Amino acid sequence: MSKSRRIGILTSGGDCSGLNAVIRAVVHCASGKGWEVFGIRQATLGLMARPPQVSKLEIDQVDPLLTSGGTMLGTTNKGDPFAFPMPDGSFCDRSSEIIAGYHQLDLDALIGIGGDGSLAILRRLAQQGAINLVGIPKTIDNDIGITEHAIGFDTAVNIATEALDRLHFTAASHSRVMILEVMGRDAGHIALAAGIAGGADVILIPEILYSMDDICYHIKHRQEEGKNYCLIIVSEAVRTQDGEILTLTNRLGQSRYGGIGEYLADQISDRIGAETRVTVLGHIQRGGIASPLDRLVASAFGVAAVNLIEAAKYDYMVAWQNRQVITVPIEEAIAQYKAVNPEDALVKTARGLGIYLGE
């Protein structure tokens, strides 16, 4: 049995399916080595709290969580600790509080599960405060460099595909154009994969320009062939024909992507008079039972992260390539944003299927 260690684990950024499967894998693997695992609540906020908000994790506690969505530890995607928003509207550097919380717990290492933004913040904290960090990539957007698969992506694709499957019947029954708006931020991975798997007729992603004239021609051409409906899937950050990225703003003044589906519907209705409906999938893509692939990758990532700690190989992230886990420096991974390559094999597949994908 290896030397006993105390390790912390936290989830940071937006939630997704597969996070609990990672936590379960870490606890199983670490417990087998005689180590203790401490779950940190609400990302770095748990280390900022006094006393730190943590709980020791046991196998019987995490075992039922393999399939469950969300994160048992809670998470947040707000509050950069280096410019933390205060009640009076000012911003304060509270990074030292997080670092102190880590050392107060006498942890030997920290496993951080997050997207590129979260991993960048955690790495900065680790460098500043002598934190032994290992990273695990998660994001439904699948835009983290080097890894072919980030936790949560496959489940999000499955959900978007099922939505297209269901919309197919309504579109055909009412002779409508049905538009499905999906997440993904500035990367079109969800729309591309789900569009192919769900039989979309038009796939629009931020990386490839499109023409409203061509979309309308595609719809009319289908009608001439006796196909009285059309399925369109669009990624949330696709621009209008004028180059504008549409956003929605809440009562607090916070903006997020949204509105491209309605924009397309109005354009299509005005140009060719087609009856058009929009479905915005939203946060449904983040929840629910994790897909088998997400559970598989999450389990492999959790074990690999523990093994990195045992080897004292810190400031590394686990990644998925060619159906196996590799390890890469966190700095290298977060520096390589992964958008859809217009020459990607899936783009060629979509074009080969006759799907309109832009110019």
Swiss-Prot record:
It is an enzyme of class 2 (transferase). The active site is at D141 (proton acceptor). One of its GO terms (biological process) is fructose 1,6-bisphosphate metabolic process. Pathway: Carbohydrate degradation; glycolysis; D-glyceraldehyde 3-phosphate and glycerone phosphate from D-glucose: step 3/4. Keywords: ATP-binding, Cytoplasm, Glycolysis, Kinase, Magnesium, Metal-binding, Nucleotide-binding, Plasmid, Transferase. Pfam families: PFK. It comes from the Bacteria. It is found in: Cytoplasm. One of its GO terms (molecular function) is metal ion binding. Its main location: cytoplasm. The record marks G117 as: Important for substrate specificity. GO terms for cellular component: 6-phosphofructokinase complex. It catalyses: beta-D-fructose 6-phosphate + ATP = beta-D-fructose 1,6-bisphosphate + ADP + H(+). ATP binds at G14, K78, G79, G115, D116, G117, S118. Mg(2+) binds at D116. Substrate binds at T139, I140, D141, R176, M183, G184, R185, E236, R277, H283, I284, Q285, R286. Its EC number is 2.7.1.11. SUPFAM superfamilies: Phosphofructokinase. Its cofactor is Mg(2+). Belongs to the phosphofructokinase type A (PFKA) family. Mixed-substrate PFK group III subfamily. Catalyzes the phosphorylation of D-fructose 6-phosphate to fructose 1,6-bisphosphate by ATP, the first committing step of glycolysis. Homodimer or homotetramer. This is ATP-dependent 6-phosphofructokinase 1.
